[in-house]
Design a protein with these regions (language model features):
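N-terminal helix-turn-helix DNA-binding core of bacterial DNA-binding proteins
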Residues: 2-35
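Residue-level signal for threonine
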Residues: 4, 63, 106
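Basic amphipathic alpha-helical segments that dock to polyanions
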Residues: 10, 29, 40-48
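Helix-turn-helix/winged-helix DNA-binding modules
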Residues: 20-22, 75, 86
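Residues within the alpha-helical elements of helix-turn-helix
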Residues: 32, 69, 86
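A short, conserved structural fragment
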Residues: 48-58
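Basic, amphipathic "hinge/linker" alpha-helix immediately C-terminal to the N-terminal HTH DNA-binding motif
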Residues: 58-76
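Amphipathic alpha-helical dimerization/coiled-coil segments
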Residues: 78-117
Length: 117
């Protein structure tokens, strides 16, 4: 199953939170993304059934498959945010727009763009 943008955002948020604090709970993801805990529960069920995350009693972990996608999304996010900030875009706008940009390019286009810059 191909991930939607929202699924990629959930994986990326778990990755970022796990790097910051180690253990990641559903409530942490909800607060990070600004969504309800019910939304996180639904998304986690879908991501777990597709092999991207494993749910523990109190926490959530990325599988190897989920970690691969999350790292890729975070790498793209950082690239686009940095590019926009270097162009003079405010940090807040760069973060919001970088989040959208990270999802819309193919791997080939992203690699070519990154190599060019």
């Amino acid at each position: 199953m191909a991930l939607r943008e929202s699924g990629e955002d959930y994986l990326e948020s778990i990755y970022v939170l796990s790097e910051r604090q180690g253990i990641v709970r559903s409530i942490d993801v909800a607060e990070y993304l600004g969504v309800t805990k019910a939304s996180v529960s639904k998304a986690m069920a879908t991501l777990e059934s597709n092999g991207y995350v494993e749910m523990g009693k109190r926490d959530v972990h990325l599988t190897e498959r989920g970690l691969e996608v999350a790292r890729q999304m975070w790498e793209r996010h950082c690239f686009f945010v940095g590019l926009l900030e270097d162009a003079g875009v405010s940090a807040e706008v760069a973060s919001q727009e970088g989040c959208h940009m990270e999802h819309c390019l193919s791997e080939e286009s992203f690699e070519k763009l990154r190599a060019m810059l």
